[in-house]
Amino acid sequence: MLSIGIDVSKGKSTVCGMKPGGEIVYTPFEVQHTREGMSELVSLLRGSGEEVRAVLESTGSYHCPVVTALLENGIFVSVVNSLRMKRFCSQSIRKVKTDRIDAMQIALYGLAYWQELQPTRLPEDTYRELQLLARQYYQMTSLLIKAKVDFNAICDQVLPGMQELMNDHAGRHKLSDFVLRYRHTTHILEMGETRFRKDYCKWAEKKGYRNCERMAALIFATAQNGIPVLPNAPSTQIVITEAIRVLHTVEASRDAILTQMQALAKTLPEYSLVREMPCIGDTLAPRLIAEIGDVRRFHSKRALIAYAGIDAPPYQSGKFCANNRHISKRGNRYLRKTGYEVMQSYVMHKPANDPIFTFIEKKRGEGKSGKLAMVAGLNKFLRVYYGKVTEFYRSLPAIE
């Protein structure tokens, strides 16, 4: 019985081996995250002659090379939630923090919870790729939102009032194309109304936008009443051009990532089942599968709900028992975000005779707020998802 505590950092780890009773077998030493370093560590653990369990704290992506190397060589690995490890280490009165001491504390954790250590398994390559792409999708979405905010701020300063006119009309890039074409209120006014109307209609027809004389008149009237803040100068034009370029580049990158996610998700057996669920489209289906991963790794539907962080743990002390509890939020925040978008889709489309939408409406009828009702609906949705997908896999014994 040998607990191996590994304190992971970027590019290297500190390793400590400990037996019951606090007997240190391997004094804390450093291992580099290289093939040579991992090979030496594996050889050391295999030569111990003991039942070895390696324990690591979850550290984002830093621990992944160590976990991969140990699992490929058949060594038991358990990656522990960082909050659990922090609370275990905080039992000490003295506040001492070094890599060597952390490795010893992790080894002690392995001994204290030897029977409760859960083995870590590497997910299938498809799920790993999907999760990687999903993270990049969210990053690109965040950048896209910022790019749109920046562009809108610039647009308000050179072409005030144009956003309100363009937002209600067809054309995903109509506003940015319009700003790139006409650049500034002064430029529109210098053209004159007759010339601008002809030019706008010709441009709209070429771009495939609605060719509307009335729209051209509204734009010219707005330009006459608008007060631009930035001058019609070369510096302003550079800022506008670059803002639009960034906006289109980030949007194209996000679309490319989503396309690849859809292609990968379609190779999974459960994709068609998830896609057939009400209000789950081509965008939400791959994102949902990416965040949940292989549903068979959860021992029950409650485990999936806890993984999403929407569970509400009970709170009771003496005669007091809390009735209204907040969700824990100790789980995958990306899954919560995606799940909330799924619930928004349910509320928008209102599928008839659907148990999840009926449940949301029931909660609203009980006086619950819209957000609370949707979180309750997400809880039910994940239970349904777990039941359908696990039952689907049970019907495919060859895959199992």
Question: What residues fall within each predicted segment?
Answer:
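A detector of single, family-specific signature residues
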Residues: M1-E400
